[in-house]
Amino acid sequence: MQVDPDAPLFFWPSRLDSIQKGPQLLTDILYQFIHKNWDRQPQFAFVANGDYQSVCKRIVDQHDFHHLVAVMDFDDNLSRLGYAAADFILMPSRFEPCGLPQMIGPAYGTLPIVHDTGGLHDTVQHLDVKQNTGNGFSFKFFDSAGLHWAMNQAMDFYLLPRPEKNAQIRRIMQENPALYNHSNTANAYIEMYEQMLERPLVL
């Protein structure tokens, strides 16, 4: 994949598992999305193993996308570089009880694109620049059209004037530690148990 600091970079951090993670939604629209945004030369980095890795490689070979798409086996160090280097994280999961990448990415200023389900629903709010709220992009229905819509929303955000875009990324990075930390989680569990027991916990 060519080095292009001005190109939007989409990062796939999870295994390429068609049962849960939804890579088929992306492969269905990858050619169309790249050609629609050809002047922006969008790039995709897959650092993941799984049954759809061969499908991704076949698309790259068939359309000669080697300068735009990299498909690599999972490597922890490379994955961490992906979080830091990318603009967006792709998580179109069919179901996701928890999920971690959508919480890791914003710490680096990398915004998640997710299917609105399970833990992704709990942790990703669709970005609203005018209201100064949200931390990513979510779509309601598990299909390629939904993912395509969310990726288009992400591209619209990417093309905003740099000061406006950077202000949102800065806000999201600053809010991320307060949203996702062990102290908040522990306090939430304590509150839940106290409500169930109808008394304070003795710690």
Predicted regions and their residues:
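Catalytic binding pocket for nucleotide-activated donors in carbohydrate/polymer assembly enzymes
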Residues: 76, 81-179
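C-terminal alpha-helical cap of glycosyltransferases
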Residues: 182-203
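Conserved donor-binding/catalytic core segment of Leloir-type glycosyltransferases
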Residues: 4-20
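A structural motif in glycosyltransferase catalytic domains
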Residues: 10, 26-27, 44, 189
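Nucleotide-activated donor-binding/catalytic signature segment of Leloir-type glycosyltransferases, i.e.
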Residues: 37-81, 138
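A conserved mid-protein helix/loop that constitutes part of the nucleotide-sugar donor-binding site
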Residues: 18-31
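Active-site helix-initiating loop/hinge in glycosyltransferases
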Residues: 21-23, 99, 181
